[in-house]
């Protein structure tokens, strides 16, 4: 009897404790509005308690340290101090705030978000090429990040959502009449790296593939034959990048990729080609290595557009953190966006908002002149930033040739110094922030110069990829002789291709 009394008393104390906690729970209503129109807008919210623990409303899409809402959310939280950051992509200023919740209190806050710039009104439309989020959440995620194009990866090596789920009538879906999501994108990520397949008309099953076999080319070649497919190299430093470039079957490459994150960098190359830590040290080194490889590709005469992807749903990023703005002018559509991306009419960013023109043309343009003539190019730039940017940079043929302080840029009325070309080459414009935790920047796509009908092909850049391929072949890990021969034949063919490029080189 005594034992039962003790148990009953203990349970009573627990119940009273739970009731006390419930009674102390406070309620706060947050409404997010556009500061100018006062209209409610979807947004992303990062909310922490005093211990740094994330607040996670159970009914809203949540990932890592944030959730999204349609613009109004009711939160039930214990007493204490809270801080928050509210964002809607880079086109709105981040709103920082805090509140103290008293026991049983009811509070409300209206949070105005200030729009810095409406890129779509200027003809630039944002997309993220690397999304791993639940399909049912993507429409709200797009609205909360002000994203216009969202290809969602639903098949990925051993994972294939459509083995159990019924395929939709159309893989392309329209969100609030002006945004596009596609539900059949795929990813082949194995020992050679990752290729992203977009605009797929159907699912392509790659679940039979193992880490080392078959070659990524085994899937790339038949997929490339499908009408309208867009193939993206997910990161420049993947081991098979020279192979994929040699194939002529890729359309873009992830200059801003998932190693660049909102609050940190993944400062390694995973299982890709490692960087020289002396040349590319510290937090920014991995991002600079991605740029270096991309510039070497351009220096071999290949014209491949830069792209951007966040890998939200796998890594910590929100959807759209790394984004590519594609210029469509007044002709924005699903197909136009992808076609213009392929043509390089792009700016990639995870922070600064940049709208560059060179001699009145958007990125991707090819300026031509006859042999013996020269071309003078002048860039004009509209720039909006939240993080501090000390310099604007003009990169020509892989080297920074101009560092323009922001105050000088302002005095010049948005004009940058002229660049004279006496031989073929390329240039782009870059704005790197002083953020010390991550590599935050914006880069235009390249502007190309072709004099005398030939592209600039660097011997050193081409040799860089030949050496890379030789190193890659030494890393093939297959004991089965037939499988090994099957994989190596693609590298041998790619090496022959690069040797031919080397023979055609016209600069050191």
Where are these regions (language model features)?
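Bacterial N-terminal signal peptides
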Residues: 6-20
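A short, Gly/Thr-enriched small/hydrophobic beta-strand-prone motif that recurs across taxa
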Residues: 22-35, 127
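Short, surface-exposed beta-strand/beta-hairpin micro-motifs centered on an aromatic residue
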Residues: 63-65, 70-77, 416
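Catalytic cores of extracellular degradative/oxidative enzymes
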Residues: 122-306, 316
């Amino acid at each position: 009897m005594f034992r039962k009394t003790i148990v009953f008393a203990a349970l009573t104390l627990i119940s009273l404790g739970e009731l006390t906690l419930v009674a102390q729970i406070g309620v706060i209503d947050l409404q997010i509005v556009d500061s100018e129109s006062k209209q409610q807008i979807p947004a992303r919210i990062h909310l922490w308690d005093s211990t740094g623990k994330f607040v996670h409303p159970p009914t809203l899409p949540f990932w890592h340290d944030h959730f999204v809402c349609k613009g109004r959310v009711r939160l039930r939280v214990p007493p204490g101090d809270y801080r928050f950051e509210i964002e809607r992509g880079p086109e709105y200023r981040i709103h920082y705030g805090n509140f103290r919740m008293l026991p049983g209190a009811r509070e409300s806050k209206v949070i105005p978000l200030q729009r810095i710039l409406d890129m779509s009104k200027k003809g630039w439309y944002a997309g993220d090429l690397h999304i791993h989020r639940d399909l049912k959440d993507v429409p709200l995620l797009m609205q909360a990040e002000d994203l216009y194009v969202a290809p969602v990866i639903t098949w990925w090596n051993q994972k294939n959502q459509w083995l159990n789920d019924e395929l939709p009538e159309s893989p392309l879906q329209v969100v609030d009449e002006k945004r596009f999501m596609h539900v059949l994108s795929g990813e082949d990520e194995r020992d050679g790296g990752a290729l992203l397949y977009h605009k797929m008309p159907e699912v392509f099953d790659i679940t039979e593939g193992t880490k080392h076999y078959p070659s990524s080319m085994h899937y790339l070649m038949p997929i490339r034959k499908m009408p309208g497919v867009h193939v993206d190299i997910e990161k420049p430093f993947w081991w098979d990048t020279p192979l994929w470039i040699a194939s002529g079957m890729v359309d873009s490459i992830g200059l801003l990729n998932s190693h660049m994150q909102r609050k940190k960098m993944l400062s390694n190359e995973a299982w890709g080609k490692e960087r020289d830590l002396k040349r590319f040290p510290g937090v920014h080194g991995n991002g600079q290595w991605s740029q270096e490889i991309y510039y070497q590709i351009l220096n071999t005469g290949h014209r491949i557009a830069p792209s951007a992807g966040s890998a939200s749903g796998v890594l910590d990023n929100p959807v759209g953190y790394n984004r590519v703005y594609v210029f469509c002018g007044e002709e924005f559509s699903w197909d136009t966006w992808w076609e213009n991306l392929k043509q390089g009419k792009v700016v990639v960013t995870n922070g600064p908002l940049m709208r560059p023109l060179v001699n009145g043309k958007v990125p991707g343009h090819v300026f031509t002149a006859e042999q013996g003539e020269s071309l003078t190019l002048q860039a004009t730039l509209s720039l909006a930033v939240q993080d501090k940017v000390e310099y604007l940079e003009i990169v020509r043929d892989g080297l920074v040739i101009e560092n323009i302080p922001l105050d000088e840029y302002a005095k010049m009325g948005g004009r940058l110094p002229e660049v004279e070309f006496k031989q073929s080459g390329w240039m782009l414009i870059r704005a790197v922030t002083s953020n010390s935790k991550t590599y935050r920047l914006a880069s235009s796509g390249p502007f190309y110069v072709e004099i005398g009908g030939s592209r600039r092909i660097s011997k050193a850049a081409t040799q860089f990829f030949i050496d890379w391929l030789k190193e890659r072949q030494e890393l093939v890990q297959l004991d089965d002789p037939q499988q090994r021969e099957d994989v190596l034949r693609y590298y041998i063919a790619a090496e022959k291709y690069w040797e031919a490029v080397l023979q055609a080189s016209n600069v050191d």
